[in-house]
Every structure is written in structure tokens, then in C-alpha cells.
């Protein structure tokens, strides 16, 4: 809700998928559906469906492995890279510039608060897992 509006037909998950694919590629991984599923902790059928949607819209391209034609890899198209650039890097660059007025003291306080919140959530999760 706080991000800039996406183009018609583009789901917020598309940006998350492309971010995940780029992160995996930077690690030297040739990305497959299973890699996205594992990295995002999502079920494979849902990932498969979203990847098909993104491919149909021109944001992703699937291609067969040269070594094993049964293996299919996924890459971001130029159109996908443009979308990712606009709604990721540009947005966060503008946001970073806007956050420049936050003092070091305020930033440290925020970090402590987030860390405390995370610790509480982890403890609650452990309690739920025991049930």
C-alpha cells in the first residue's frame, strides 16, 4: 500500500519474484521454479502459476537447460528488468534520499525497536510451535 502504484495487471508479487530471481542469479544460481519456491518459502504450484503469468506478460522467459532438456530455467526479460528498476531501485533511491533527515539517534532507536519486536515475535513463534 505504501509503494507507488503498479501498472495495470502487475501484481506486487511480481516485484518480489524478480527480486528473488536477481538475488539468486547474483549467487551464481541458474534459477528454476524450485529455487524460487525454496527462497520465498512458497508452494511450487503457486510459484509455477505466477511464473506462467509473468512469462505471458513478458516479464520472465523460460528456457531449457543445454545439458538436460528436462530442466527449465527462468530469467528476467528486458521488460521485467525495466519494471524491477522502476519499482525497486528507483523507489528505494528516492526513499533513501527522503530518509536523510533522520538523525543517527533516531535510526539507532528504530533499529533497537525492530530488533526487540523481532525477538518477541520469534519467542511467540516458539510458543506456538510447542502447542
Predicted regions span which residues?
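Charged, amphipathic alpha-helical coiled-coil/dimerization segments
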Residues: 52-109
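C-terminal regulatory/oligomerization modules of transcriptional regulators
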Residues: 105-131
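N-terminal positioning helix adjacent to the helix-turn-helix/winged-helix DNA-binding module
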Residues: 13-17, 32, 79, 106
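N-terminal amphipathic alpha-helix
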Residues: 1-20, 117-121
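Short, locally clustered residues in the helix-turn-helix/winged-helix DNA-binding domain
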Residues: 19-26, 88
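Key DNA-contact positions within bacterial/archaeal DNA-binding proteins
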Residues: 45
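The alpha-helix within a helix-turn-helix
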Residues: 37
Amino acid at each position: 500500500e505504501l509503494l507507488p502504484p503498479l501498472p495495470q495487471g502487475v501484481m506486487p508479487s511480481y516485484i518480489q519474484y524478480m527480486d528473488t530471481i536477481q538475488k539468486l542469479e547474483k549467487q551464481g544460481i541458474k534459477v528454476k521454479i524450485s529455487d524460487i519456491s525454496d527462497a520465498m518459502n512458497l508452494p511450487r504450484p503457486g510459484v509455477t502459476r505466477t511464473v506462467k503469468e509473468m512469462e505471458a506478460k513478458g516479464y520472465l522467459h523460460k528456457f531449457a537447460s543445454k545439458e538436460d532438456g528436462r530442466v527449465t530455467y527462468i530469467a528476467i526479460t528486458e521488460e521485467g528488468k525495466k519494471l524491477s528498476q522502476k519499482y525497486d531501485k528507483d523507489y528505494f533511491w528516492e526513499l533513501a534520499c527522503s530518509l536523510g533527515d533522520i538523525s543517527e539517534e533516531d535510526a539507532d532507536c528504530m533499529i533497537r525497536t525492530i530488533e526487540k519486536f523481532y525477538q518477541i515475535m520469534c519467542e511467540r513463534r516458539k510458543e506456538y510451535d510447542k502447542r
